[in-house]
Amino acid sequence: SSLLNILIQIAIGLLKAIKMKVIISMSGVSHRFTIAGYNVPKYLIDVDGKKVIEHIVDLYPVDSDFVFIINDDCAKNPHIPAYLESLNIDKLTLCSVPVHKKGPVFSISEFEHHIEDDEQVVINYCDFSMDWDYYDFEEFVNTTDCDGCVVCYTGFHPHMLGGDNYAFCKTDDDNKILEIKEKEPFTNNKMLEFASTGTYYFKKGSYVKKYFKELIEKDINVNNEYYVSLVHNLLIEDGLTNLVYEVPHMLQWGTPLDLDMYNQWSDYYRKVIEGQKEIVLPNCVTALPMAGMGSRFSEVGYLLPKPCIQVNGHYMMDRALHCLPKTDKVILGALLKHKDLLPLRDYGEVVWIDEVLQGQACTTEKIV
């Protein structure tokens, strides 16, 4: 048993010495971004001080074997290939394909001669980033010896509030993928499903060649585009093992709305971390009406009045006041029956309301 473990570790070490082929497909025309006013390809848009492609490259070791696939229009612009070749990576094969709308599987199939049959291949889309540990992922696929793997996330992410859908995985209890749908969740609550980040792993380059060709020949598409996610269904049909590798956070920039939502959240958290510049409004009063019952919160088990519910270690009312400009005086309007529950001794002037009124406007009228 101990000898077997040693041999397994040696095998993993040898596999680590062989770098995965990382193919980044970015040959699309970014039509929605063009309509939204962007004048560069999606992968060259600035996000948090770096271009999208830089975020993607940073997901992998600098000595990875990269293949970038762009379209001919971008390739004809001398600044774009020059920029891509200047990135901090050791090995890059830059390819271009005529402009088309057939999806990433078609683009990658055009350059299968760059893929060795026995090498591991990761295919990465060009419009996101994520919180992950590449070396943990590498160890996961090598230890499990899976034939395919989809990097996924679950739970709340801001872009999940929008109407756009991505690829979703149906799994068993061991996170073995049973089926993948593109642009469509399996249930009415997509936040509980495994959603693909846009990173797809294949144990062998021969799988990429065989199943990408099969997907196109069988014309398995969504809106006339051939997606990498759907290739995994073909592997599954042939009895090959495909697993989910879960990451805690994913940053989606696939559409202008996704990017706008991300930037809003990013700006907010940056201000929280760095501290907002204090705004002072002289000759003004801040009125905080909080004399409601908070019935929706109590119905789901909250015992304290809503203003005192903790949000990231602070009272909800503190969070609200922190977002507001500093004024000469703060007046709180609170419900009298909550007097013993609300720690308002240090909050300046408090007006206690005898009964629940018809909304915040009525409460404000009482306290100012």
Predicted regions mapped to residue ranges:
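Short acidic donor-binding/metal-coordinating loop in glycosyltransferase active sites
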Residues: C126-F128
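Conserved core of the sugar-phosphate nucleotidyltransferase
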Residues: M130-D219, D340-L342
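Alpha-helical elements of Rossmann-like donor-binding domains used by nucleotide-donor carbohydrate transfer enzymes
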Residues: S109-E110, D136, L230-V231, M261, ...
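Serine residues within intrinsically disordered or low-complexity segments
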Residues: S1-S2
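Conserved N-terminal catalytic core of the sugar/cofactor nucleotidyltransferase
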Residues: L7-I10, L15-I24, R32-N39, I45-D46, ...
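Conserved alpha/beta core of the MobA/IspD/sugar-nucleotide pyrophosphorylase nucleotidyltransferase superfamily
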Residues: V22, E193-T286
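A structural signal for short hydrophobic beta-strand segments in well-ordered beta-sheet cores
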Residues: L44, C169-T171, V244, C308
